[in-house]
Structures are given as structure tokens and as C-alpha cells.
Amino acid sequence: MELGRATKSWSIHTRSEIIGKYKVMERIGSGAYADVYRGRRLSDDLTVALKEIHDYQSAFREIEALQMLQGSPNVVVLHEYFWRDDEDAVLVLEYLTTDLATVISNAAKEGIPIPVGELKRWMIQILCGLDACHRNMIVHRDLKPSNLLISDCGVLKLADFGQVNLIALIIFILFGFST
């Protein structure tokens, strides 16, 4: 199984539509359904995260949710995506340098508490991101510190929407109308 996964992960480096627009750099994360690479957009040198999703349902849910949440200041930005039926989806996402799990771990190791004002600001940003989700009838279902990314200027954003429930889609399928 690992051999197959390694082969799939390598496909991001060989797909012409991706390498024609992006330089794929080091892998920065890996999970059950996806691998994430740091990348650089060739047209303007923008650093991005390239998320290769190996599971069809996770890819569908994440793309749908991020498209619905475009413009929300506390949700990671989806720049574009590449997806064909016979290959893994690759999402081009906003690159954020750290996550809340890393910040908490570093603070604990260094014995330096995170300032209360910073914690309050992040809590408000988490709630704003969740509010955007809930207004769009999206339930995240995988909120944890490692899925809360933080920019260099301290803005916290919700990420990893592969396990979401799209309530509006469920209502449409069950009842044939939208809310």
C-alpha cells in the first residue's frame, strides 16, 4: 500500500499542467488522504501549498467547501485546482507558515506562555471561520490545532476541508431543492 501511495505522490512532479505553472518543492505534510508540498507559482514567484488528494470523496468535499467559502478572511484560500478522473486532485492553496499545534508545542518547549491577547484574537478568528462555514451550511468535522493555520502576520485560518459535511448538498439530494 505504501508503494502505491508513493507512486501516486510522485505524480504531482510529472503532470504537465502543474509543472508548467508551478515549481513543486519539498513535502511539508502528509496525512491519510493527502500529501502537501510547498510550491512556487512560476508567473509571479508566489509561494503556495500544493495539496495532492488521493481520495475522490475528500477531494470533492474540499473543493466544493473552499469554493463556497472564497473570500472568507479566516479560511485558507483556494487559488485553483487540477483534477481529472484518472488522477489525484491537486489543490493550489494559500501557503501559511505554521499551525496552532506547532505554536502550542513551541511555547510549551520554550516555557513561554502564549499571550492572552493573542489567544483571544485567535479564538475570535476561529469563530469567524466557523461562522462562515455554518452560514454556508458546511460542518468542518476535523477541527484541531494542526488544521488551524497561521500566517506570518498572525491571521488564523481554517484548513483541511476534506472531511466536511455539505449540508446544502445533502438537503438537495434528499429533497430536491436548495435552501
Mark where each language-model region is.
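Juxta-kinase regulatory segment immediately upstream of eukaryotic protein kinase catalytic domains
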Residues: 1-16
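Conserved N-lobe ATP-binding subsite of Hanks-type protein kinase domains
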Residues: 35
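The N-lobe alphaC helix and its flanking beta3-alphaC-beta4 segment of protein kinase-like domains
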Residues: 52-73, 79
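Short beta-strand micro-motifs within the conserved protein kinase catalytic domain, predominantly
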Residues: 77-89, 97
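Structural motif in protein kinase domains
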Residues: 96-106
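Activation segment signature within eukaryotic-like protein kinase domains
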Residues: 122-123
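Catalytic-loop of the protein kinase fold
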Residues: 134-150
